[in-house]
């Protein structure tokens, strides 16, 4: 099965294809989503200095907002490629987990985006559920 990791990285594209030759050149997500992914990665390169990971206040780079946008992109990729395995490297989670170097395990910052995740309406969740009632 074809696999893609959505991950911001320096000198990257915002994604990494995880299958050898099989999926090379077949990451067909459409121009608008490809451009969104590229802009997201460019913002990481331009504004996220590696030293920002050491800033516990998060004042240098908004990891939470950046990760939320990345998750939205990963969900959109999964909707476009439902047969693919899509994983997402969560920069906010990585930033948080790296606070304790004794227990830091970078693999905990990556998780799979399922079809259920991809089609979940986050606006309902933020409003307290389908009835719109706060929880």
Which positions does each model-derived feature cover?
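Intrinsic low-complexity, intrinsically disordered or marginally ordered coil/linker segments
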Residues: 1-135
